[in-house]
Amino acid sequence: MTDLTAEAAISPSDDILLPALASLREGHPDKGILKLLAQLKIDHPEWAVSEKRFRKALQLAPCPGGGEADPKEKALVADTGLDPSIDVKSIAPKVEVKMFAGGKGKGLVAKEELKQGEMLWQEEPWIVTSDPGHYSLLTQSMMCSQCFSLFARPSPPLSVPCPHCTTAHFCNRLCYTKSLSSSHPPLLCPGLNPDASSLMNFIRKRGERSVEGVAKILARWRGEREWDAKGKAEEMEKRIWKGMARVSQKRKEMERREWSYISKARMEEWHLIHIMLTNVLNPSPTHENYKPFQRLLISQHPRRSKPVPLTEKEVKRWFSFESFLELLGLVGLNQEDSGGLYALHAHMNHSCEPNIQVRNLPKSYTPPTQDTLPVNLPPPIQAGDRVSNKLTILARHEIQPGEELTISYVNMKMSRDERRQALREGYGFWCACDRCMREKEQPNGEKAE
């Protein structure tokens, strides 16, 4: 039988499609790309629009407020959503999560008036990744592998070494316990999973911090799936695949002008890393690490139960090459330099004139009380200050209720062109904040004072 719907379907011109996509995005700010495409098919069943064209057109659709995206400056639209596992009210009572229209995704806004210097919340990373500059300190037991606190001397009294390997050392028992899910999971401990040694050595030799983040995400999910209550693995799945902003690393790098020259080498490199990760965290029955890995899963299980094989759906979701590229892009978008991945911090969007300051403050820092506000922001860190990877979120100046909380993803002292290029290469978008618009007419994107 002839499909009359398909026969009658038309391909709308950009003049018709782009305004429709702008309205669609405005009306459904909480939906990702695929759900928006499904909604478009519901609203306009007479149209024939492929996913490839839809993605490209969405980048060129008119922006909120009447402005239009520059066709020469199309942005990558990240898949994102809300993370139901974060109890924002208890972490940051004066802050709430908001879904913005126009493909911007989620962000944070003030619920109440905030004063200069006010501490909004403090947060530890849920996935810890180390700066390459810390490697020598970590391998010499001069720094805690969990919180990055410096030791006065190697392996000081009361500190806790990993009981299974020599590659991790901790301030105390608390940091060691936290590390089992965030910085030194059993599945990546060389003493428990010998194949992890070559992977971690590769990461540190190459300074592949984003790969470290992917490895620890996979190790945490696999551990929670095997050993903990099922709810934790499901909670993490929602955070990763529905809550955090992500763009495939391949899609991101395909936008680079030199992609045609580097694509072959990059694809080969990614395939190699993917194979290494799979052999360490999901070895096939024919791989030499399969039986040792199965024994490890059994030994760490509270009841020494035999592991249940991953389903085909789980393998595709977590260990396929496409998922690896998605996770690599996710870590690149959300990773904070001082410690790794932070759940609530990852909600904040960029501005070249941010109203929020993110700091690693001394452990002696005491937040100001309400009756002492407003106050100046804390002074720079001094030599000898004991700091960690805990983030302290501060208001740079007075912030009104409903105002979005923003941070700068790049060095604010760079020129407009330098900032925008860094944001495009690192995060997939061309900044159009108020400062960038003001400086647009200034020759050479004048640098900030």
From Swiss-Prot:
Domain spans labelled SET: 93-410
Compartment(s) of residence: Nucleus; Chromosome; Cytoplasm
Coiled coil: none
Main location group: nucleus
MF GO annotations: histone H4K20 methyltransferase activity
GO cellular component: chromosome; cytoplasm; nucleus
GO biological process, one term: methylation
Known catalytic reactions: L-lysyl-[histone] + S-adenosyl-L-methionine = N(6)-methyl-L-lysyl-[histone] + S-adenosyl-L-homocysteine + H(+)
Keyword Phosphoprotein: no
UniProt keyword annotations, A-Z: Chromosome, Cytoplasm, Methyltransferase, Nucleus, S-adenosyl-L-methionine, Transferase
Matching Pfam families: SET
Listed EC numbers: 2.1.1.-
Homology family: Belongs to the class V-like SAM-binding methyltransferase superfamily. Histone-lysine methyltransferase family. SET5 subfamily.
Entry function: Histone methyltransferase that monomethylates 'Lys-5', 'Lys-8' and 'Lys-12' of histone H4 (H4K5me1, H4K8me1 and H4K12me1, respectively), thereby controlling gene expression and remodeling chromatin structures.
Stated name of the protein: Histone-lysine N-methyltransferase SET5
Species whose genome carries this gene: Cryptococcus neoformans var. neoformans serotype D (strain JEC21 / ATCC MYA-565) (Filobasidiella neoformans)
